[in-house]
Regions:
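N-terminal FAD-binding dinucleotide-binding subdomain shared by FAD-dependent oxidases/monooxygenases
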Residues: 1-257
Length: 257
């Protein structure tokens, strides 16, 4: 089973994982698969048109559901694509002036995908507050460490490949990387470990330079993007992520005995 899981993980990484970071041939396959699934399951051309996005596949997070197309075609379901203008006592009024009466309104508007450790208070060296460090944009070194915050490590931090690969797999690889750093402290070799600012700057510059090739910057609005339109995603291959997480380069860290 482990071998099967590893094989399927690598297959996914070599198809979808490459599609989202600029492999046009793989992206075409993803889009063709999504389109064929829609056409096979929704016969009404008007509804099918409403269900067809006006942005590239995977620009927003793809949702895999075995029953959504069947549910949306039931007599008691209606797909409304008009923007919401306001919520009134009797229901929701859309921008075309139509009032959609309802008994219950469920606000499934998502979450803050860029909060990470916030709103928890985290104070680093010299009293620096994480909220201030991340006031404009969220960055970390290799997604797990922050300059000026010794002995602090996180899983699934900024620019982790949450939109490319299995969240479980990437968390396990990040944890293995972090544990190698913690073992230095447990062995008494160091008292403090934190990312060097220059190393973090180089890492984040490489992320920014590669992001222009990805699907996340092709024009849609999603929770992948921060307020400046920067995706907190991983713009490289699965193999590179695995290599980066195999062992820490101690030259990238400030080690205090």
């Amino acid at each position: 089973m482990d071998e099967l899981h590893a094989s399927l993980t690598h297959l996914f990484a070599d198809t979808f994982g490459r599609a989202v970071i600029g492999d046009k041939e793989q992206m075409q396959r993803v889009e063709d698969t999504c389109r064929a699934n829609l056409e096979d399951n929704v016969r009404d051309p008007e509804l099918r048109a409403k269900l067809t996005p006006d942005y590239q596949a995977a620009c927003k997070r793809l949702i895999i559901s075995p029953g959504f197309y069947q549910a949306i075609q039931k007599p008691n379901a209606e797909l409304v694509t008009q923007p919401i203008d306001r919520v009134e006592a009797g229901g929701v009024r859309t921008r075309d002036g139509r009032l959609h009466g309802m008994d219950v309104l469920v606000l499934a508007t998502g979450f803050d995908g860029h909060s990470f450790m916030r709103p928890m208070d985290l104070i680093g060296r010299d009293g620096v507050d994480l909220k201030d460090v991340w006031a404009e944009t969220t960055q970390a070194h290799r997604s797990i460490s922050l300059p000026g915050f010794p002995n602090y490590f996180m899983l699934v931090g900024p620019n982790s490949p949450i939109g490319n690969f299995s969240l479980i797999d990437i968390s396990e690889r990040q944890l293995s990387y972090i544990m190698q750093l913690i073992e230095l402290w447990r062995g008494g070799e160091v008292n403090e470990i934190s990312a060097r600012q220059d190393a973090a700057d180089r890492f984040n510059a490489s992320i920014k330079a590669a992001m222009g090739n990805t699907v996340w910057v092709t024009g849609c609005q999603s929770w992948y993007l921060d307020k400046h339109g920067n995706p907190a995603m991983w713009p490289f291959t699965f193999d590179k992520f695995c290599a980066d997480m195999s062992a820490p380069d101690l030259e990238e860290y400030e080690l205090v005995s």
